[in-house]
Amino acid sequence: MGLKDFVDKLKNIKKSRIKIEEGAWIKCDKCKNILYIEDLLKNLKICPHCGYTFRMNAKERVDSLLDKVYSYDLFPKIKPVDIIGFKDTKRYKDRLKEAQEKTGLNDAIIIAHGNIYDREVVLASMDFNFMGGSMGSVVGAKFVRGVEFAIEKSIPFISVAASGGARMQESIVSLMQMAKTAIAIDRLNKAGILYISVLTDPTMGGVSASFAFLGDIIIAEPESLIGFAGPRVIEQTIRQQLPEGFQRAEFLLEKGQIDMVVDRKNLKKTIYTLIRHTHG
């Protein structure tokens, strides 16, 4: 082997190591420690040093809560359509394609069916990685069908919100989903079916103003940003500085807007206990 070939080989080895290292480690946003991703996943994406909770995708959330999964998505054939031919800096069609390739999902929600320990449930899990978890026609349609499935089987319905709000690319159609999901929850209530709403970071806009705050029991993960408009928008509007921790889960608990703040490690057990005590 010549000197040039040897040097090229060393460069290739170095490049492959860099790729492996870049994909294997992540920095904690809070304490800035470097974490091994495999260990982080085993710890429910909670930093072992400071307890900071990284955002989970929809499937990770299902895996963290359900012991047995009958279906990760009961309605996989429902797909988004560019109803109004929306275009900003990109066409909506292109944004959808990019999000689908990035996440492997059709849209920002999956409706899972499975067991938490020995209790059968329906779990609506949102994915912030899909266009900011924005709610459009598909999110609304799948959510409603999930509720109908829970009513049909007389089993608890759980939603895990992670969203920036309504999807602007669908205009008024996205806003319609607020009423649509709220009406579905009303049917769930009339059927006497338990609805537990879990709010994660972030739960904002049209999602917070609809199904996310309609739970019989509302749980939030620690330090989650929860509200309608963001804090910067509010400060600019009222021209006042907001209180420390405003719109964080602990602040909302103190003001009586949610029922409890539960650490991710205790979330499954807490939900199970609530189901046992309220759903027979």
Curated annotation (Swiss-Prot):
Zinc-finger listed as a keyword: yes
GO biological process: fatty acid biosynthetic process; malonyl-CoA biosynthetic process
Broad class of enzyme this protein falls into: transferase
E.C. number: 2.1.3.15
UniProt protein name: Acetyl-coenzyme A carboxylase carboxyl transferase subunit beta
Listed InterPro entries: AcCoA_carboxyl_beta, Acetyl_CoA_COase_Trfase_b_su, ClpP/crotonase-like_dom_sf, COA_CT_N, Znf-ACC
Name of the coding gene: accD
Domain CoA carboxyltransferase N-terminal: 24-280
Subunit structure, as described in the record: Acetyl-CoA carboxylase is a heterohexamer composed of biotin carboxyl carrier protein (AccB), biotin carboxylase (AccC) and two subunits each of ACCase subunit alpha (AccA) and ACCase subunit beta (AccD).
Cofactors required: Zn(2+)
Catalytic activity entry: N(6)-carboxybiotinyl-L-lysyl-[protein] + acetyl-CoA = N(6)-biotinyl-L-lysyl-[protein] + malonyl-CoA
Annotated zinc fingers (C4-type), start-end: 28-50
Pathway assignment: Lipid metabolism; malonyl-CoA biosynthesis; malonyl-CoA from acetyl-CoA: step 1/1
Naturally occurring in which organism (per UniProt): Sulfurihydrogenibium sp. (strain YO3AOP1)
Keyword Mitochondrion: no
Annotated Zn(2+) binding sites: C28, C31, C47, C50
Gene3D superfamilies the record matches: 2-enoyl-CoA Hydratase, Chain A, domain 1
Pfam families: Carboxyl_trans, Zn_ribbon_ACC
PANTHER family: ACETYL-COENZYME A CARBOXYLASE CARBOXYL TRANSFERASE SUBUNIT BETA, CHLOROPLASTIC
Sequence similarity: Belongs to the AccD/PCCB family.
Source organism superkingdom: Bacteria
Subcellular location: Cytoplasm
Cofactor note text: Binds 1 zinc ion per subunit.
PROSITE patterns: COA_CT_NTER (PS50980)
SUPFAM superfamilies given in the database record: ClpP/crotonase
Keyword list, A-Z: ATP-binding, Cytoplasm, Fatty acid biosynthesis, Fatty acid metabolism, Lipid biosynthesis, Lipid metabolism, Metal-binding, Nucleotide-binding, Transferase, Zinc, Zinc-finger
Primary site of residence: cytoplasm
Any one GO CC term of the record: acetyl-CoA carboxylase complex
